[in-house]
UniProtKB/Swiss-Prot annotation:
Organism, as annotated: Piper cenocladum (Ant piper)
Gene it is expressed from: cemA
Keywords: Antiport, Chloroplast, Hydrogen ion transport, Ion transport, Membrane, Plastid, Plastid inner membrane, Potassium, Potassium transport, Transmembrane, Transmembrane helix, Transport
Disulfide bonds: none
Family the UniProt entry places it in: Belongs to the CemA family.
Entry's transmembrane regions: 7-27, 106-126, 154-174, 189-209
Protein's recorded name: Potassium/proton antiporter CemA
Main localization of the protein described in the UniProt heading: plastid
Subcellular location(s) of the protein: Plastid, Chloroplast inner membrane
Membrane topology designation: Multi-pass membrane protein
Length: 229
């Protein structure tokens, strides 16, 4: 059993990290032609929510106004006006194609997320014994680290997640998740989440340090506060 315990964790850690990602990516690549064909062959050409439809209309109106303004300032004859409308039509077709590609990407990404979640759930249900071994191995590894390294690691992680420069990273990550699940970009909601998540994490961290680390390793707390100052 000790030998199994020593050899088992690394492969399981690698599989837990990479296997769900690899399975979801494989499914995504295999589903892409089918979903693309299904989407493009649908009788209804659009599948937009209200916010996305509003965004498309705004882009179309902006494009039309810019082209009209450009032609008016040139004082073009009627033939040029006809070319203008042909140009608007071509740009509209291009805009529809871009939106179709975005919708296909959203469907594929949601499918990949579901498959990844299902794979992790399968791990939790079918590989419970192996997860217990991995958990004990991680705890033993962390326990053998010195208090200085532990404090440095905590300080590094907290500075990355809730430090002065963390909002930009949170904005990119939340915006990416927001887009993956098919929601239209909303600056107010993303800004609200960016300003809320670090505060929640900071509160949880302080409670954890006060409630757990103070009881388990007071010296680690002292080193952490000294390095933080």
């Amino acid at each position: 059993m000790p030998k199994k315990k020593a050899l088992a964790p690394p492969p399981y850690l690698v599989s837990i990290v990479f296997l769900p990602w690899w399975i979801s990516l494989s499914f995504q690549k295999s589903l892409e032609p089918w979903i693309t064909n299904w989407w493009n062959s649908r009788k209804s050409e659009t599948f937009l929510n209200d916010i996305q439809e509003k965004g498309v209309l705004e882009k179309f109106i902006e494009l039309e106004e810019l082209l009209l303004l450009d032609e008016i300032t040139k004082e073009c004859p009627e033939t040029q006006i006809q070319k203008l409308y042909i140009g608007i039509y071509k740009e509209t077709i291009q805009l529809v194609k871009i939106k179709n590609e975005e919708h296909i990407h959203i469907i594929l990404q949601i499918s990949a997320n579901i498959i990844c979640f299902a794979t992790l759930s399968g791990y939790a249900i079918l590989c419970n014994e192996e997860l217990v071994i991995v958990n004990s191995w991680i705890q033993e590894f962390l326990y053998n680290l010195s208090d200085t390294i532990k404090a440095f690691s905590i300080l590094l992680v907290t500075d990355l997640c809730i430090g002065f420069h963390s909002p930009h990273g949170w904005e990119l990550m939340i915006g990416s998740v927001y887009k993956d699940f098919g929601f239209a970009h909303n600056e107010q909601i993303i800004s609200g989440l960016v300003s809320t998540f670090p505060v929640i994490l900071d509160t949880i961290l302080k409670y954890w340090i006060f409630h757990y680390l103070n009881r388990v390793s007071p010296s680690l707390v002292v080193i952490y506060h000294s390095m933080n100052e």
